[in-house]
Amino acid sequence: MQPAIQAEGLVKRFGRNTALGGIDLTAEEGTVLGMLGPNGAGKTTAVRLLLGLISPDAGRVRVLGRDPRTADARTRIGAMLQVARVPEALLVREHLDLFSSYYPRPLALAEVIHRAGLEDIVNRRFGELSGGQKQRALFALAICGDPDLVFLDEPTVGMDLHSRRQVWEEIRRLAAAGKSVLLTTHYLEEADKLAHRIVVIDEGRLLRAGTPEEIKRAVSGRRIRCVTRLDPDLVRRLPSVISVQRDRDATVVFAESPEQVVRSMLGEDDSLHGLEVSAAPLEEAFLALTGGNAART
């Protein structure tokens, strides 16, 4: 079975800026690949390369075993991008009819409307919709052709909780039907719940790839939280420490060997208290891997 996505050594430069510095990506058929990274990490560039919208300066891309720029590949791909420009004067129903015409075997209109939850807006003009409603309509356009591979770039931004969970169920349904999904998201809970594998990208480099559990273990899955008078810079210099953050009055440490770190901290501060050692949630693992750049996410 060939991978749905196979990219090797992807490099893309814009002038002197290297947006991608030679990354490899693989997504198997019937799986959801989650792509995480701060703004400016290279996620959008990677998606555009995989869709064949731009060409790499080096490396090779295949989707469904084909060059993504070919007509054969494009009739088997659906995409929902962050920046989508569609005529605002058309009704949502008219957009669905138009996009469905691009595919050889599109889904029935009634099925698309139901799966994307468009019953209340299908006869409204696109320009009249709220941000969350537009996202639902764009999701419908991505799946209306019954594609084998779907690119979803921040699909649930602006949606209410009910709509977000409805899209989650549809993503699960796509994978269960043997479709493949590449999902970029700022909602780390979304990646944790939906993705079979996750890749973490920052500054054009692939930092880590694995299952959600493997990503959590990549920061040694160990999160130390305590109240200490030790300076965070001192804690950062201790062996096996990956990152140190402040959480109100507490210090939060990610470490490969938590026992060693706790012993060292107790040796320096016998007043240390409120000690907790636990597995790292995906959000905190992500922040640790990307250097805690929360402001960039």
Model regions and ranges:
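Residue-level preference for beta-strand/loop junctions
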Residues: 2-3, 220
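An acidic, carboxylate-rich microenvironment
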Residues: 58, 72, 94, 111, ...
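Short, charged/small-residue-rich alpha-helical element at the C-terminal edge
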Residues: 221-297
